[in-house]
Amino acid sequence: MKNFFRKTCLAVATGALLLAGAGAANAATITIVNADGANEGFNDPTPVLPVGGNTGTTLGQQRLIAFQFAADVWGALLPSAVEIRVTASFDPLTCTTTTAVLGSAGPRTYSADFANAPLAATWYPAALANKLSGVDLNPGAMNSTADDLRAQFNVSLGGATCLPGSGWYLGLDGNAGSSINLVVVLMHEFGHGLGFISLVNNSTGALFSSKRDVYSNFLYDNTVGMLWPDMTSTQRVASAINPGNVAFTGQWATWNADNWLGYASELLVSAPAGVAGSYNVGDAGFGPTVASTPVTGQVVLAIDDTAPTSDACSALQNAAALSGKIAMVDRGTCAFAVKVQAAQDAGAIGVIVVNNVAGAPSSMGGSGPAVTIPSVMISQADGVTLKAALASGLTATIHSSATKRAGADPLGRPLVYTPNPLQSGSSVSHFDTSAMPNLLMEPAINSDLDPD
């Protein structure tokens, strides 16, 4: 549990919820309000065996225990004297045999210009507004809009028409195996409901009801040197698709980033002098980490026998030239792990993948259990520059930076997720996927989030 608390701290700080410092005396009480009907969801009477520390004897009980467990983790970190209520239910959500909406959570209401509000004309989600004001600003009955969060999760998961073979893991120990860890998804979605959410329309740049929101108030675009509230709508639209250049400027978030994020991977070119310097990279989700397996060597373009001949998707023709070198390959045609494996089989000690679209380099997903060499991606523009220097004896090191944090800007502020093109439901209201270790509020579940 200690590590999971640490992984959650940065999300808390960024959500502006840790304004006074959390402590046992101030811990928030988060109450799960059961909105399910008889014999469904939390009230499902199906008998089950205890699993992973979850002692419930029915399916409904285990679901509720998992919900309350996640709520208690958040509550231990949040200083609030006002009870936080979560309207919660299990419902059939959008689902196919290959994709599914796992669940969602968000604030039920927002408040602005209340007593003790730190910023005027600024929307605050219900739980945060109540904490700051010291009173419940919207009192009322349970299971109504007087509750602070609304959470819905997919009751159909694992069924014949909804990601068959998956299903929710209801244990509290992180040992989900091939199932989907409900506690991890709950922690993420509760984060949105507690304040990790932008109210700006990312497609139009418009503010919500003509007011700024507390989350977006801290977004800073390093390209134009402006905070989001000071931008025009047109500028905000552009900023929402400015990958790697939008940071969260909150003091607590920056402090936690420096204490939690690891050092970023980088490509350091030492020769020829005309292109020497540090280049930003995207990491691979397979093979060894760059930090554990740094390599230095001459860079050689991989050549295969099928056009396009530099993507390493068919038999390599220059294996001898690649042996003991760092291979450069182009993105496209086949999976990242296939390219890296081909270079490794030819004797390469590392791989540089050149992006095939404009913009920042992305992370490389996929599975490569036999891959033992490090690999990184560089941008398309940097690829053009470095390819032009290959004939001059391009020499580089793939390693971890000594100064730059993974997932942070040059000032150490955590980056938010602003891919191009825009990803509805994911852009802006998540941390950037370049963070290492991965963070709770990234747009996808990852192995770093087990509540260990």
Q: What is the predicted role of each segment?
A:
Residues 11-20:
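Bacterial N-terminal signal peptides
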Residues 27-187, 193-265, 391-452:
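Extracellular zinc-dependent metalloprotease catalytic-domain scaffold
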Residues 181-194, 339-351:
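Active-site alpha-helical elements of protease catalytic centers
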Residues 1-6:
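N-terminal secretory signal peptides that target proteins for export/translocation
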Residues 14, 67-73, 335-341:
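Short alpha-helical segments and helix-capping/turn motifs at coil-helix boundaries
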Residues 254-422:
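Structured lumen-facing ectodomains of secretory-pathway proteins
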Residues 20-26:
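Bacterial Sec-dependent signal peptides at the C-terminal "C-region" and cleavage site
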